[in-house]
């Protein structure tokens, strides 16, 4: 095993000129830093060059980390996929979401699904075809799943149940979840009185010095909320400064 003390840059140098067989060996036998660097390098091969590695070795592995890396690779292959390849990968990701018992594999597959919807501008037709198959994701209350769903939902077609899911998770105590959901709400231009009131309530429970506090205020500014004005005034009075996130929102 490679020492855990190696950095991302060490891994980059070590994997820079390796063949696909050597990269596979890194994925199978290294620590996570080297595994993911090797995986990123494998993404620069054509799909038909790494298809057997993905399907017959990584996805067939009893180790969840190998399966997680397999679906990670599939989401961001850098060489353009043809329709047959894209459909095959979509099927693999949906299967992993539905049937793999590992939460880390499921969340990685959801992230990859989002990347494909974004990169290939997949829309209503493709989502309709997989929608029922992935409906279990809305009921899994696990941190990594919620993050993955929040990211990917930015590139899925509009659905009221997705909007409700996101609003529900604005109550999360995890700052990263709040960040992703605010990003998605902004991207989708979702706004409503219920979102506004929920976020105002969150401000009352959030440390004024936290990044989350500033993100919430920036979002409220972006939807032209008048209720946020006292909170901005309070920042100016108590801190004599405006965070970059808020400043950029005010400029728009």
Please place each PLM-identified region on the residue numbering:
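Structural detector for internal amphipathic alpha-helices that build alpha-solenoid repeat scaffolds
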Residues: 2-14, 29-46, 65-84, 104-121, ...
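Short coil turns that connect the paired helices of HEAT/ARM alpha-solenoid repeats
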Residues: 25-33, 59-65, 98-102, 135-141, ...
């Amino acid at each position: 095993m490679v020492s855990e003390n190696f950095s991302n840059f060490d891994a980059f140098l070590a994997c820079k000129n390796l063949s696909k067989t050597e990269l596979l060996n890194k994925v199978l036998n290294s620590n996570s830093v080297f595994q993911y660097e090797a995986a990123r390098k494998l993404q620069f091969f054509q799909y038909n060059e790494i298809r057997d590695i993905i399907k017959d070795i990584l996805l067939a592995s009893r180790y969840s980390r190998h399966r997680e890396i397999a679906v990670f690779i599939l989401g961001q292959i850098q060489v353009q996929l043809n329709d047959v390849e894209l459909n095959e990968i979509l099927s693999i990701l949906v299967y992993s979401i539905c049937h793999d018992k590992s939460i880390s594999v499921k969340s990685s597959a959801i992230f990859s699904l989002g990347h494909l919807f974004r990169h290939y501008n997949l829309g209503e037709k493709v989502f309709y075809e997989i929608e029922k198959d992935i409906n279990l994701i809305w009921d899994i209350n696990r941190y990594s799943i919620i993050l993955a769903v929040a990211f990917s939902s930015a590139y899925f077609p509009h659905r009221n149940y997705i909007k409700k899911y996101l609003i529900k998770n604005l109550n999360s105590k995890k700052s990263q979840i709040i960040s992703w959901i605010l990003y998605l709400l902004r991207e989708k231009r979702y706004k409503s009185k219920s979102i506004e009131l929920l976020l105002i309530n969150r401000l009352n429970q959030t440390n004024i010095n936290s990044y989350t506090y500033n993100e919430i205020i920036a979002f409220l500014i972006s939807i032209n909320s008048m209720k946020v004005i006292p909170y901005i005034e309070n920042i100016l009075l108590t801190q004599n400064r405006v965070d970059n996130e808020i400043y950029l929102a005010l400029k728009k």
